[in-house]
């Protein structure tokens, strides 16, 4: 009562290739954090425009060092003029927000093109910087600074 069915081998090659013409169904959304700053990043195919809380990159970050820091992941993978970046930044100061934005952009680039991961990881753009302000302790003036000691 056992029937033998012929086994047929079917070779299916489903290779996914990522290229510049990758079409997004919706914008890529990621989050970057640094110190007290939190940044929500939306990556959309475009011409390299930055929109940070409704302002341009140069208006929001007038410091050239911060601008270079933010553009670094895009320059590393040669996609500076491939995407438009829309970001909502809040909390922290300019340095923390710039670091958070860099992390958010790097994470979004990986979602858009996973082949970029080794280059971004080697440049340490995917590492969340854990350093934050140490809390003030009672009995001390600051986190570690003790009040002046008088022997007599």
Curated annotation (Swiss-Prot):
<dbReference type="InterPro" id="IPR014721">
    <property type="entry name" value="Ribsml_uS5_D2-typ_fold_subgr"/>
</dbReference>
<dbReference type="InterPro" id="IPR023035">
    <property type="entry name" value="Ribosomal_uS9_bac/plastid"/>
</dbReference>
<keyword id="KW-0687">Ribonucleoprotein</keyword>
<comment type="similarity">
    <text>Belongs to the universal ribosomal protein uS9 family.</text>
</comment>
<dbReference type="InterPro" id="IPR000754">
    <property type="entry name" value="Ribosomal_uS9"/>
</dbReference>
<dbReference type="GO" id="GO:0003723">
    <property type="term" value="F:RNA binding"/>
</dbReference>
<dbReference type="GO" id="GO:0005737">
    <property type="term" value="C:cytoplasm"/>
</dbReference>
<dbReference type="GO" id="GO:0003735">
    <property type="term" value="F:structural constituent of ribosome"/>
</dbReference>
<protein>
    <recommendedName>
        <fullName>Small ribosomal subunit protein uS9</fullName>
    </recommendedName>
</protein>
<dbReference type="InterPro" id="IPR020574">
    <property type="entry name" value="Ribosomal_uS9_CS"/>
</dbReference>
<dbReference type="InterPro" id="IPR020568">
    <property type="entry name" value="Ribosomal_Su5_D2-typ_SF"/>
</dbReference>
<dbReference type="GO" id="GO:0015935">
    <property type="term" value="C:small ribosomal subunit"/>
</dbReference>
<dbReference type="Pfam" id="PF00380">
    <property type="entry name" value="Ribosomal_S9"/>
</dbReference>
<dbReference type="GO" id="GO:0006412">
    <property type="term" value="P:translation"/>
</dbReference>
<keyword id="KW-0689">Ribosomal protein</keyword>
């Amino acid at each position: 009562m056992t029937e033998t069915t012929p086994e047929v081998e079917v070779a299916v090659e489903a290779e996914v290739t990522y290229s510049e013409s990758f079409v997004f169904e919706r914008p890529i959304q990621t989050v970057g954090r640094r110190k007290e700053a939190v940044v929500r990043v939306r990556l959309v195919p475009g011409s390299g425009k930055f929109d940070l809380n409704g302002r341009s990159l140069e208006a929001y970050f007038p410091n050239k060092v911060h601008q270079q820091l933010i553009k670094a992941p895009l320059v590393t993978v040669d996609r500076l003029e491939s995407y438009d970046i829309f970001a909502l930044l809040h909390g922290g100061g300019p340095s923390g927000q710039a670091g958070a934005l860099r992390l958010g952009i790097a994470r979004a680039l990986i979602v858009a093109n996973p082949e970029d991961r080794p280059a971004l990881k080697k440049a340490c753009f995917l590492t969340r910087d854990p350093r934050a302000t140490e809390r003030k302790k009672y009995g001390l003036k600051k986190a570690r600074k003790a009040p002046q000691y008088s022997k007599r």
